[in-house]
Amino acid sequence: TFRSNLGTNYAFYRKQDFEGASSIDRLGQNSTSLSKIKSSEKSFVNWDNIISYNKTVKDHTFGATALTSWTQSKYTSVNAQGEGQLVDSYLWHNLGANDKSSYVIGSDYIQHQTFSYALRFNYSYKGRYMLTVSNRWDGDSRLSKGNKWASFPSVAAAWRISDEAFLKNVEALSNLKLRLSWGKTGNSGIMAYGTQSGLTPKTNSAFQDNGYTYYIYNEYVGNENVGWEMSNTWDLGFDIGLFNNRISAVVDLYQTKTTDILLPRTLPTSMGGSNATPFKMYQNIGATMNRGIEVSVNTVNVDNKNFKWNSTLTFAANHEEITDLIDGKDIIGAESSITSSLLIGRPLRSYHYFINQGIWQENEAEEAAKYFKDAKKTQSFKPGDIKLQDLDGNFIIDDNDRTYLGSQSPKWTDRKSVV
């Protein structure tokens, strides 16, 4: 069989605004009017082509599937504004009537594409023993030449134990299946053009009266060496059904090792910045390990033609830790100074900051004065300042007193539902 699916999402936005010279919005703006227009278009196209073949020979079932998938995301925008038009009734319909020295014009275009193809082979014997082997090749235009493509193989096997003769007489058992799988997955999720350095033109500047345009570096510095983040996952699970599946459960134990973690990293301020903001760069920054358990239990409490009542409980526990980083060193403030440090042996996006012990009080002025905010001991603490714990005991509160405070990753989650 052959199937082709084409889907698209499209959004159009347009905003027109006029603020008269005497309006509240223009108070303190030299009594001039403001006219502006902004419009944008966003589109997403997905085209999948799938061909499949299935064949049964006695107790043996074979299947093969091949597919291609193409996506394109596109965003365009344009905006223009001016100040000082003398006829309010023009509103935003005649931007050329504004003072030419006030013109601000901007536009943007962002586009990226992905292309994938995959092969999958299935085999089943009596629906009791099952094997699936597949491979997927993905390409992403956001990555640089030589790093755009990656391959993701996988293999999965299952054994429906409840179909074996030695369990046929266990009436309470409706289903029992053991599953084992291994596979690779990837992540190329960087911003469009994230591997390239660029410039942003500025025309709304003090030099505009003289017809000058200036440029600043983009916040993100290009890195052509960025490649796919790769994850290897082992999963061991079983499905069980009891009493004609009135009670069923799914349990999975997994371990995922990820290499070449793809994250934006805030660079040292010594390297400069853009618009008073430190530069950032996408990097394959290290490796992590995740392992955990997921359990889902479902019960059919009432099931008749007039009423049905199901209950579901899910529970998941996960341990995550960074196993390696660039140069083998922690990266403090990888994305922000407090909430996104990368610490070996800790989860991703850890909190690394001072321990807050409250506020220095008036009756603690003498004690507060023993602690200093700088290495030269010229600025001591005083009542009203935040009391930070001095971990190294040198009476100087500095970066050496920051410590691990936790992470954004929960140790466990659960959910209950009744329908």
Task: Label each residue range with its predicted role.
Residues 1-19, 29-346:
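Extracellular/periplasmic, surface-exposed regions of secreted and cell-surface proteins
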Residues 79, 283, 300-414:
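Conserved small-residue
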Residues 418:
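Conserved small/polar residues in nucleotide/adenosyl-binding loops
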